[in-house]
From Swiss-Prot:
Fe cation binds at residues 111, 115, 301. InterPro entries: ATPase_NBD, Gcp-like_dom, KAE1/TsaD, TsaD. It comes from Wolbachia sp. subsp. Drosophila simulans (strain wRi). Belongs to the KAE1 / TsaD family. One of its GO terms (molecular function) is N(6)-L-threonylcarbamoyladenine synthase activity. Its cofactor is Fe(2+). It catalyses: L-threonylcarbamoyladenylate + adenosine(37) in tRNA = N(6)-L-threonylcarbamoyladenosine(37) in tRNA + AMP + H(+). Required for the formation of a threonylcarbamoyl group on adenosine at position 37 (t(6)A37) in tRNAs that read codons beginning with adenine. Is involved in the transfer of the threonylcarbamoyl moiety of threonylcarbamoyl-AMP (TC-AMP) to the N6 group of A37, together with TsaE and TsaB. TsaD likely plays a direct catalytic role in this reaction. This is tRNA N6-adenosine threonylcarbamoyltransferase. Binds 1 Fe(2+) ion per subunit.
Length: 335
């Protein structure tokens, strides 16, 4: 059995987990930074300072709760990209320092791979499988062929889907993060009232574009006085628009996989936006694949997914040198 201590500091969550190859989570400590909610978004310098302040305490707490010592660990893992460079430096340097002192291997984890693989901690999802990663920083389709081996089928050409949710929410006068509030208000709205643009729909390929939807919502806000019902109707119409785009792109992704002679049975939807229950139900109803969603606490950033990915990589003997430099941009294809 292998056991890993993992660190996640790529954005505004400071998290530490201890995970083993028997699929047990021995400890998980996470601290979300409420400061960003008051400011309407993540401030990189504030985020990195908070990581510096809290990370060592979370590591100490996780080790104590696991009833292990550093000598009991088989490796130390950290999210080393992509993400905000300040946070990545804090987490990666701390993990490398522990690895050096404890004489343990260091594993640099790609944040995107961690989102893609965490489902295998919970379910018997076999390679190859299709991944739709929809989060605050990323929106892309991947075929996961194996640990460390991916084919990117498409991605956003402008904003990520999470950014689109947050920016639309801000236009409507809602607080950050916008996704949960849009989903809540949409339940009281009429999704057929406003016809928002479905960019790139019915076109070949798996790329996305969400800038036109934002512009359309901005125009609605300027045209209407935006009563409470108007806001609910815009939220519902926005979600209907997003679901139509995702369904169209998923159909194309399946066709593209077939053209590559890759048989896909399992489809994993992951990332923070995958916690949206409306989108989950739409995809379940219309996609003829085995669909898997991580639980909500594993859709958003966490250290459990980093620890599990560390286990998967350790089992392949994928070890990284202590001079590995954090990467704010890190394509999963080249992993």
């Amino acid at each position: 059995m292998k056991t890993i201590l993992a660190v996640e500091t790529s954005c505004d969550e400071t998290a530490v987990a201890i995970v083993n190859s028997d699929k047990q989570v021995l400890a998980h400590e996470i601290l979300s930074q409420a400061e960003h909610k008051k400011r309407g978004g993540v401030i990189p310098e504030i985020a990195s300072r908070a990581h510096m302040e809290h990370l060592s305490g979370l590591i100490k707490s996780a080790v104590e709760k696991s009833n292990l010592n550093f000598c009991d660990l088989n490796a130390i893992a950290a999210t080393s990209g992509p993400g905000l460079i300040g946070g990545l430096i804090v987490g990666t340097m701390m993990a490398k320092a522990i690895a050096h002192v404890a004489q343990k291997p260091f594993i640099a984890v790609n944040h995107l791979e961690a989102h893609a693989l965490v489902i295998r901690l919970l379910h018997e999802v076999k390679f190859p499988f299709l991944v739709l990663l929809i989060s605050g920083g990323h929106c892309q389709f991947l075929i996961a062929q194996d640990v460390g081996k991916y084919i990117k089928l498409g991605e956003t050409l402008d904003d990520s889907l999470g950014e689109a949710f947050d920016k639309v929410a801000k236009m409507l006068g809602l607080s950050y993060p916008g996704g949960p509030l849009i989903e809540k208000l949409a339940k009281k709205g009429n999704g057929a009232r406003f016809k928002l643009p479905r960019a790139m729909i019915k076109r070949y390929g798996c790329n996305f574009s969400f800038s036109g939807i934002k512009t359309a919502v901005k125009n609605l806000v300027q045209e209407l006085k935006m009563s409470e019902q108007d806001v609910c109707d815009v939220c519902a119409s926005f979600q209907e628009c997003i679901s139509d785009i995702l369904l169209d792109r998923v159909s194309n992704a399946i066709i593209m996989a077939e053209s590559l002679n890759i048989k896909i049975n399992d489809f994993v939807i992951t990332g923070g936006v995958a916690a949206n229950n409306f989108l989950r139900e739409k995809l379940k109803q219309h996609i003829n694949l085995n669909i898997f969603f991580p639980p909500n606490d594993l859709c958003t950033d966490n250290a459990i997914m980093v620890g599990w990915t560390g286990i998967e990589r350790l089992q392949k003997n994928y070890i990284d040198p202590l001079n590995f430099a954090p990467r704010p941009k890190w394509e999963l294809e080249s992993y």
